[in-house]
């Protein structure tokens, strides 16, 4: 991954983290890795554990960002979520939501819950 792409991803994740905090989420982990799988942000609010993918767009895109969640991405997120839950037993009884935070530099953030 190029430094420019990494920097852009970090910027998007920072914006998304601040957005989630504004919605009363507690950020537990950023860039959580399990085996070859990654979850951008893991947060908790009340009794729900949120596993969020972040997509950062510098310009306005005319498509629904939820289409970025193909079967391979879903499988990897589920595997990473299982790893996190195995390592953090205190969250075993929480509800789980797989989410997307779409960050547009000009339009702000949009949050998609319970994608799969």
Swiss-Prot record:
* Listed Gene3D superfamilies: 3.40.1350.10
Q: Please name the InterPro entries in this protein's record.
A: Restrct_endonuc-II-like, tRNA_endonuc-like_dom_sf, UPF0102_YraN-like
Any one GO molecular function term: nucleic acid binding
Protein family (similarity comment): Belongs to the UPF0102 family.
Q: HAMAP family, per this entry?
A: UPF0102
Q: What is this protein called?
A: UPF0102 protein LIC_11564
Species classification = Bacteria, Pseudomonadati, Spirochaetota, Spirochaetia, Leptospirales
């Amino acid at each position: 991954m190029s430094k420019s792409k990494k920097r852009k991803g970090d910027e998007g994740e920072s914006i998304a983290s601040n957005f989630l905090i504004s919605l009363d989420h507690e950020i537990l982990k950023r860039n959580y890795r399990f085996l070859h799988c990654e979850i951008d942000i893991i947060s908790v609010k009340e009794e729900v554990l949120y596993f969020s993918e972040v997509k950062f767009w510098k310009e306005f895109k005319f498509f629904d960002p939820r289409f970025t969640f193909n079967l391979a991405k879903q499988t990897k997120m589920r595997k990473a979520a299982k790893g996190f839950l195995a390592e953090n037993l205190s969250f075993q009884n929480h509800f789980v939501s797989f989410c997307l935070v779409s960050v547009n530099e000009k339009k702000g953030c949009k949050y998609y819950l319970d994608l799969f």
